Amino acid sequence: MKVITKVAELRRALADVRNAEKRIGFVPTMGYLHDGHLALISASREHCDVTVVSIFVNPTQFGPNEDLSRYPRDFARDEALCGSAGVSIIFAPSAEEIYPAQFESFVEPGELAKPLCGAFRPGHFRGVATVVCKLFNMVQPDVAYFGQKDFQQCAVIRRMTVDLNLPIEIVTVPTVREPDGLAMSSRNRYLCPEERDRSLAISRGLFAAAHEFASGERDAATLIALARRHLERVDRLQYLELVDPGTLRIADSPLRYPAVLCVAAYVGSTRLIDNVVLSWSPS
């Protein structure tokens, strides 16, 4: 496994891979890897010859009062996990390598970036789209892998690749959860034991709505109200919305296949997001 910090070196290493006509898979991360990231790596290794993992805490996707300075970082741990998982290349650039002096060109996403997280984190998806576009240009993968937990991010990136004619397949991998249902996230480490227990209200609310949907309930207000009852244990519910997975607009009620129930909530000072897809196979 190679650890590369410079774009020029990365391009040289991957030129040899392309010349050998090998398929390149890419997993962009901000580090502090967990089993969710390892599932993305596993998916890449299953379908690609070479897997590149980027580790870069992207400053442009954090707001002024967010957790950039305290976002968890442990490169030695990440390197060991990548080595055990069979990663071919770790790309771990500095902020100066990604955003050199006089940098001023950004990717401005459209309507998909406005609802849900976009309504509460202005500029977030601008930063996400910009860094992912830059990483795509640096790595030039055949396939890139993202987790379903970040459903809106996946939608924004998929739209960007289409709009900018990037020849990259975007694969979404199902959310990986702790045994008790909590969606895996690097930010879970912020939670004290009492907050960790209350954070289960998020997945339990989503699962309760999904169970009711599977039992035949199609009224959006009823499903949202059921999830909201569980979410009374969080400190602040930022949003709980049923949306169309293609447009991220509020889904029509009664629900039509499919819809996504999305939530963002604070437990203590930690902001957590999660979602569940509500769908069925037409008979």
From Swiss-Prot:
The UniProt record gives the binding positions of (R)-pantoate as Q61, Q153
Q: Per UniProt, where does beta-alanine bind?
A: Q61
Q: Which InterPro entries match?
A: Pantoate_ligase, Pantoate_ligase_C, Rossmann-like_a/b/a_fold
Which reaction(s) does the protein catalyse, per the Swiss-Prot or TrEMBL entry?
Answer: (R)-pantoate + beta-alanine + ATP = (R)-pantothenate + AMP + diphosphate + H(+)
**Pfam families assigned:** Pantoate_ligase
Q: In which pathway does it act?
A: Cofactor biosynthesis; (R)-pantothenate biosynthesis; (R)-pantothenate from (R)-pantoate and beta-alanine: step 1/1
Q: Where is the active site?
A: H37 (proton donor)
What is one term from the GO cellular component aspect held by the record? cytosol
How would you classify this enzyme at the top EC level?
A: ligase
Q: What is its EC number?
A: 6.3.2.1
Intracellular or extracellular location(s): Cytoplasm
MF term (GO), any = pantoate-beta-alanine ligase activity
- Chain positions recorded as ATP binding sites: 30-37, 147-150, 176, 184-187
What keywords were assigned to this record? Answer: ATP-binding, Cytoplasm, Ligase, Nucleotide-binding, Pantothenate biosynthesis
- Any GO BP: pantothenate biosynthetic process
Q: How does it assemble?
A: Homodimer.
Q: What does this protein do?
A: Catalyzes the condensation of pantoate with beta-alanine in an ATP-dependent reaction via a pantoyl-adenylate intermediate.
Q: What else is known?
A: The reaction proceeds by a bi uni uni bi ping pong mechanism.
Q: Can you tell me which family this protein belongs to?
A: Belongs to the pantothenate synthetase family.
Q: What is this protein called?
A: Pantothenate synthetase 1
Q: Which species is this record about?
A: Bradyrhizobium diazoefficiens (strain JCM 10833 / BCRC 13528 / IAM 13628 / NBRC 14792 / USDA 110)
Q: Which gene encodes it?
A: panC1
